[in-house]
């Protein structure tokens, strides 16, 4: 997949990749465990791609779901579950969701602190929590984050990653899961 398509998915190749039932499914168990979703939750998936994770959550958990993606092609693929928008300006009301997920998209966000502030804004202040599954710095240049894609992404050490939600006003943040190629960041408003 080309760098351009990974950063703003569009076209046939992107639809086949991000609309696939196995697209990023390696992250699903970790995110679902961290969020501990129940049928009364309201989940927003930021950078939802083709909506495959959202459909899985709807089937397995039965909670309310919504997604947002900056690629119009991905929003069409995820319809009617997703809307077009940017992580730095989420088109949702304050406190609308009890959980926010972001799977393998965070490292593309140009302003991660602003994106996290927006995630915090749309979270219920009492019940809210986030789970962000992102690519670890050790993966840079590997098949998980090949060049030139690796030069466009933001890779964070565990300490740097945990500091970002705290800068965005979250009260707590931690690395909940770590692999050589991935990190799972969890935070509460």
Tell me what each language-model feature is:
Residues 44-89:
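Class I SAM-dependent methyltransferase SAM/SAH-binding core
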Residues 101:
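A conserved beta-strand element that flanks and buttresses the S-adenosyl-L-methionine
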Residues 153-168:
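Short alpha-helix
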Residues 1-36, 52-56, 74, 138-140, ...:
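Conserved class I S-adenosyl-L-methionine
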Residues 113-127:
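A short glycine-rich, Lys/Arg-flanked "PGG" loop and its adjoining helix->strand segment in the class I
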Residues 177-189:
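Core SAM-dependent methyltransferase catalytic element
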Residues 104-107:
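Short catalytic micro-motifs in class I SAM-dependent methyltransferases
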Residues 127-134:
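Conserved beta-strand signature within the Rossmann-like core of class I S-adenosyl-L-methionine
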């Amino acid at each position: 997949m080309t760098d351009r398509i990974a950063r703003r998915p569009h076209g046939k190749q992107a639809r086949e990749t991000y609309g696939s039932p196995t697209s990023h499914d390696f992250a699903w168990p970790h995110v679902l465990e961290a969020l501990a979703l129940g049928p009364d939750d309201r989940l927003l998936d930021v950078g939802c791609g083709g909506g495959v994770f959202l459909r899985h959550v709807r089937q397995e958990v039965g909670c309310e779901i919504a997604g947002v993606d900056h690629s119009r092609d991905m929003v069409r693929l995820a319809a009617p579950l997703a809307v077009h928008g940017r992580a730095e300006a989420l088109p949702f009301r304050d406190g609308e969701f009890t959980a926010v997920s972001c799977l393998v998209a965070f490292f593309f966000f140009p302003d991660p602190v602003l994106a996290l502030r927006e995630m915090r804004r749309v979270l219920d202040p009492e019940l809210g929590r986030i789970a962000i599954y992102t690519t670890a710095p050790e993966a840079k240049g590997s098949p998980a984050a090949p060049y030139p894609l690796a030069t466009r992404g933001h890779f964070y050490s565990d300490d740097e990653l945990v500091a970002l939600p705290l800068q965005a006003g979250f009260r707590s943040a931690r690395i909940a899961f770590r692999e050589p190629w991935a990190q799972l960041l969890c935070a509460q408003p």
